[in-house]
């Protein structure tokens, strides 16, 4: 199993086939509009402006699982991201990243039986998962680590 095996819904409700990411390094991140870490959107966009394209992608999944910090509709979330941070990387429809209704992408990212790397507890909003060109999970990055952290930039460039 790999990240490329999934099809998700974009923020505007269209199918987004993750197999289109083959050959790209990807950061998968759960996001929220009313979180103390929400300014990381700016760093994510900086990263996307610098590296996004043929070799790198960011996929954001809004989730209301931590502190009810993403209460908005998909339309409201999309407007917030565009207006406040000029987000141009793909944002998906709001999902759950924990619990009984955990989305299948996050089941893959957090369960060793599915990702082959390890079990990863979801800690908070803006937790980042680094996925290689083959759709394999390579690293789980804590929420407080900025997207422009040297270790992430080095991974993108490697």
Predicted regions and their residues:
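Thiol-/selenol-based redox modules, centered on thioredoxin-like
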Residues: 107, 111-158
């Amino acid at each position: 199993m790999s990240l490329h095996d999934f099809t998700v819904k974009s923020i505007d409700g269209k199918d987004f086939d993750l197999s289109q990411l083959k050959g790209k390094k990807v950061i998968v991140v759960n996001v929220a509009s009313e979180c103390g870490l929400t300014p990381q959107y700016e760093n994510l966009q900086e990263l996307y402006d610098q590296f996004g394209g043929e070799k790198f992608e960011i996929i954001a999944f809004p989730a209301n699982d931590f502190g009810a910090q993403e209460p908005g509709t998909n339309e409201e979330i999309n407007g917030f991201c565009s207006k406040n941070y000029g987000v141009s990387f793909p944002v998906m429809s709001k999902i759950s990243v924990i619990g009984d209704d955990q989305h299948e992408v996050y089941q893959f990212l957090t369960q060793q039986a599915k990702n082959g790397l390890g079990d990863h507890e979801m800690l908070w909003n803006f937790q980042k998962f680094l996925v290689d060109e083959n759709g394999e999970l390579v690293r789980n990055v804590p929420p407080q680590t900025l997207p422009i952290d040297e270790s992430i930039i080095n991974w993108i460039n490697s």
